[in-house]
From Swiss-Prot:
Recorded coiled-coil stretches: 115-146, 269-291
Function: Acts as a component of the GARP complex that is involved in retrograde transport from early and late endosomes to the trans-Golgi network (TGN). The GARP complex is required for the maintenance of protein retrieval from endosomes to the TGN, acid hydrolase sorting, lysosome function, endosomal cholesterol traffic and autophagy. VPS51 participates in retrograde transport of acid hydrolase receptors, likely by promoting tethering and SNARE-dependent fusion of endosome-derived carriers to the TGN. Acts as a component of the EARP complex that is involved in endocytic recycling.
Gene designation per UniProt: VPS51
PANTHER family reported for this sequence: VACUOLAR PROTEIN SORTING-ASSOCIATED PROTEIN 51 HOMOLOG
Protein name: Vacuolar protein sorting-associated protein 51 homolog
Low complexity biased stretches: 1-18
Complexes and interactors: Component of the Golgi-associated retrograde protein (GARP) complex, also called VFT (VPS fifty-three) complex, composed of VPS51, VPS52, VPS53 and VPS54. Component of the endosome-associated retrograde protein (EARP) complex, composed of VPS51, VPS52, VPS53 and VPS50/Syndetin. EIPR1 interacts with both EARP and GARP complexes and mediates the recruitment of the GARP complex to the trans-Golgi network. Interacts with STX6 (via N-terminus). Interacts with VPS50 and VPS54 in an EIPR1-independent manner.
Gene Ontology CC, one term: recycling endosome
InterPro entries found in the cross-reference section: Cullin_repeat-like_dom_sf (IPR016159), Vps51 (IPR014812)
Family statement: Belongs to the VPS51 family.
The keyword Coiled coil belongs to this UniProt entry's keyword annotation: yes
Length: 781
């Protein structure tokens, strides 16, 4: 309350001060000084150069030890005005009331806690008093118990020693009793067939009998036990040799014989011999299933039988052998490995024979499942008998079967391709029914392409089963690398594409062999098929293969560009051969028409010969046929009078000097020399020039071969006047229709000029027909 009285009231502001407004300036300076004091870390007294703390002897210091209320009140009355004193009193009253209220609240809030704490302390004091009493009683009881225990121990010391001695004697007597009863126990166990119990009895007593065998009584017991043990060993050997029981029972017999001290080497040989008999029986059972009987199980059942019978038995034999004859060391392990290697090779031979019967089937799913079970079953013996190499041999068999399946699928693709070509041949050779058109070349080409592509996809899906994640051998290095790159991509896909190209090229053989009977339309279709493969199909197939079979092998593979180049070359050869075949067909007609006619005695021409009409018809049909598969191509600019030109013996400049009216015998000139001079300035015609992949180039090649044949045949014949005129009419007719098929019409003009000029040279009386008459005959024809 003294502090509250000393504090100025909240209502005393600057206006109530006696200084009034004049005190505002010093107040601001004090605030500024206070901020500086806080900045430099100085107290108010230090900032003014005075001591920082109040005087401890000051009687007006409310917090000091020498505070004097009377002095403090006198000071306030002297220094403070009445208004400030009243404000101080009001503020003091308010603070006293607030303090009183806070103290009452504090007392009320903690009253219950104080009461509870008091009760708890009182109860703890009572409990500790009771505990001290009980501890005292416990200490007294413990002292009494200790005293009694000491007296009892002292009293029982001598009897305890006697009891210990008696217990030892009793145990010895029990052991002796067991030893004396051992022969009878062994005999009873042998009679009951409890061979394991008998061996355990013998094992427990063996060391004692060996130790005390110098005593007559123990010696007799040992002799009796040896006789019984010998009989027991004989019965165990008899049971083991009978082999009627399974592998676990035989292993138990061997284990008991080893416990009886029988020679391990001899038992090892007998154990393997009996195991060989059982496993060979399993092999004979498997071999019996390889017969041609219709009731023979499928390959999946066969591998299940072999896995559960032979492989399971081999695992049992290996596990029992390693457990029983572990003391044999490396020699025993090698003996077991040789045993497993020999029988395993016979089992693998049977499996391969059975798998070979599946090579003709087209479904890989059952075969892959069988291979998976076969490979999975051999994991256990492969781990037990690592030295025998069973797992590696099984993997090699699976890899070999996979390679054979790839070869089988390649043959299937080749057969499918040949079958498609056979279908095309039949469709081309089938007679046309009136009013019903057969399939066109474009449709046949689409059918062949889709059929081949579907067979390729089916083969890829079939061989992809070998690399499925759920298959146990798919993680082997071969199936993650070489199988995908060299097997599927190179052997199957690339091999088939090359085989297809070779088969197509075989149709280009010389006449009289295979190519002589090949329909020209088939050559045209195959050339377009190979060209389509070069442009898109090869890239698509190889991309599909690489996506399905993620190649992890770094071995080199055939680039796409190489295959495309081979396919394009095959297409070029086929198209070139097509041009030759069609050209020879037309040439044969022209040659026969020239060679079988008597040109010296022929009549004056009135019509175009029928063979020329047939040539134009066949050429038009070829144009339609080629147009179904190939684009038009590029032609040179055509002259406006291509169809109006009329051939005559003087249409060529080299013949004008001979047949023009101005020619007189007084100006002789060798016509052959004139013809040869003209040839020097004419463009050379390459009859068998490379054929481009368009219709114009194909027709140009065929027409060049035909007209060149006509020219050579004409040069070998002699013509009369009317014969020359007939050739003139025929050539004009050909010119009217053939110029539109070739890339350059000048080529047709040049060759036909050569034909007419050659006929004129071979005519003794060359009198040409008037051009107007020729045109009339051709228009009428």
């Amino acid at each position: 309350m003294a502090a509250a009285a000393a504090a100025p009231g909240p209502g005393s502001g600057p206006g109530d001060s006696p200084e009034g407004p004049e005190a505002e300036g010093p107040e601001r300076r004090r605030k500024a000084h206070g901020m500086l004091k806080l900045y430099y870390g100085l107290s108010e007294g230090e900032a003014a150069g005075r001591p920082s703390g109040p005087d401890p002897l000051d009687p007006t210091d409310l917090n000091g030890a020498h505070f004097d209320p009377e002095v403090y009140l006198d000071k306030l009355r002297r220094e403070c005005p009445l208004a400030q004193l009243m404000d101080s009193e009001t503020d003091m009253v308010r603070q006293i009331r607030a303090l009183d209220s806070d103290m009452q609240t504090l007392v009320y809030e903690n009253y219950n806690k104080f009461i509870s704490a008091t009760d708890t302390i009182r109860k703890m004091k009572n409990d500790f008093r009771k505990m001290e009493d009980e501890m005292d009683r416990l200490a007294t009881n413990m002292a009494v118990i200790t005293d009694f225990s000491a007296r009892i121990s002292a009293t029982l010391q001598d009897p305890h020693e006697r009891i210990t001695k008696l217990a030892g004697v009793h145990a010895l007597l029990r052991k002796l009793q067991i030893l004396f009863e051992l022969p009878s126990r062994l005999t009873k166990c042998v009679e009951l067939g409890a061979y394991g119990q008998a061996v355990r009895y013998q094992g427990r007593a063996r060391a004692v009998l060996q130790q005390y065998q110098h005593l007559p009584s123990f010696r007799a017991i040992q002799d009796d036990c040896q006789v019984i043990t010998a009989r027991l060993a004989q019965q165990l050997r008899q049971r083991f040799r009978e082999g009627g029981s399974g592998a676990p029972e035989q292993a138990e017999c061997v284990e008991l014989l080893l416990a009886l001290g029988e020679p391990a080497e001899e038992l090892c040989e007998e154990f393997l011999a009996h195991a060989r008999g059982r496993l060979e029986e399993e092999l004979r059972s498997l071999e019996a299933e390889l017969g041609p009987s219709p009731l023979a199980p499928d390959v999946l059942e066969f591998t299940d039988h072999g896995g559960s019978g032979f492989v399971g038995g081999l695992c049992q034999v290996a596990a029992a052998y390693q457990e029983l004859f572990a003391a044999q060391g490396p020699a025993g392990a090698e003996k077991l490995a040789a045993f497993a290697r020999e029988l395993g090779s016979r089992y693998f031979a049977l499996v391969e024979r059975r798998l070979a019967q599946e090579q003709g089937s087209g479904d890989n799913s059952l075969l892959v499942r069988a291979l998976d079970r076969f490979h999975r079953r051999l994991r256990a013996p492969g781990a037990l008998l690592a030295a025998a190499g069973l797992a590696e041999a099984a993997t090699e068999i699976v890899e070999r079967v996979a390679r054979e399946r790839l070869g089988h699928h390649l043959q299937g693709l080749q057969a499918a391709f040949l079958g498609s070509l056979t279908d095309v041949r039949q469709a081309l050779a089938a007679p046309r029914i009136a009013g019903k058109e057969g399939p066109g070349l474009a449709e046949l080409l689409a059918n062949v392409a889709s059929s081949i592509l579907s067979h390729i996809k089916a083969s890829l899906a079939s061989v992809h089963l070998f690399t499925a994640k759920e298959v146990s051998f798919s993680n082997k290095p071969y199936f993650r690398g070489e199988f995908c790159s060299q097997g599927v991509r190179e052997s199957l896909i690339v091999g088939f594409i090359r085989s297809m190209c070779q088969t197509a090229q075989s149709f280009c053989d010389s006449p009289g062999e295979k190519g002589g009977a090949t329909p020209p339309a088939l050559l045209l279709l195959l050339s377009r098929l190979c060209l389509d493969y070069e442009t898109a199909t090869i890239s698509y197939i190889l991309t599909l293969t690489d996506e399905q079979f993620l190649v992890q092998d770094q071995s080199p593979v055939t680039p796409v560009s190489t295959l495309c180049a081979e396919a394009r070359e095959t297409a070029r050869r086929l198209l070139t051969h097509y041009v030759k075949v069609q050209g020879l067909v037309i040439s044969q007609m022209l040659r026969k028409s020239v060679e079988t006619r008597d040109w010296l005695s022929t009549l004056e021409p009135r019509n175009v010969r029928a063979v020329m009409k047939r040539v134009v018809e066949d050429t038009t049909a070829i144009d339609v046929q080629v147009g179904l598969l190939y684009e038009e191509g590029v032609r040179k600019a055509q002259s406006s009078d291509s169809s109006k030109r009329t051939f005559s013996v003087y249409s060529s400049s080299r013949q004008q000097g001979r047949y023009a009216p101005s020619y007189t015998p007084s100006a002789p000139m060798d016509t052959n020399l004139l013809s040869n001079i003209q040839k020097l300035f004419s463009e050379r015609i390459d009859v068998f020039s490379p054929v481009e992949f368009n219709k114009v180039s194909v027709l140009t090649g065929i027409i060049k071969i035909s007209l060149k044949t006509l020219l050579e045949c004409v040069r070998l014949r002699t013509f009369g006047r009317f014969g020359l005129q007939q050739v003139q009419v025929d050539c004009h007719f050909l010119q009217l229709y053939l110029w539109r098929f070739v890339a350059d019409e000048e080529l047709v003009h040049l060759l036909l000029d050569e034909v007419v000029a050659s006929a004129a040279l071979r005519c003794p009386d060359p009198v040409p027909m008037e051009p107007s008459v020729v045109e009339v005959i051709c228009e009428r024809g």
